[in-house]
Amino acid sequence: YGSASRKNTKPQAQIGLGCIYDVMNRMILESDCNKVKFDEMRLAEKQLERIPETIGNIPFIIIMDRGYPSTPAFIHMMDKGIKFIVRLKSSDYKKEQSSLSENDQLVKIKLDKSRIRHYEGTIDGERMKELGEISLRMIKIPLENESLEVLATNLSEIEFSTNEIKELYHMRWGIMPISA
């Protein structure tokens, strides 16, 4: 909405929209408008807090694209019992991704000083120190262009198979028309 531009530059939007979209029922459950530059994960965490007000205690799985995940976000969701599937960037948990020996594997992520440093002196940093490690299920999915995408989840193999996780994640692409 709205735009601001300088001479000889492309117009830029002046607000940013963050929303949680129900891919099964094709409806927005939570949304917020913000200034253009905002912390999407912090906003998502606030929206996740409000989901029970919107849908009651119906179980749900949050599906997020690259750019959202962070160790504190994963811990926050796991502490709240929120199930998630998140696409990782190749730079997220790089050591763990490169050492995956299977396409679907439970991985222990050590929360060492290098991972905590950025959060030092915060509640997130203290929680990371307290836990010492987290476990995430990492799933490698081959893409048509012969590259790999890696998903991280706290859903067990008993709850969802590798193929079901892949199908659930790709349902996320149905929201792209609303974000264009």
Language model: regions and residue ranges:
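Single, function-defining residue in the core of a domain
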Residues: 9-180
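Active-site- or DNA-interface-adjacent structural scaffold in DNA-acting proteins
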Residues: 1-2
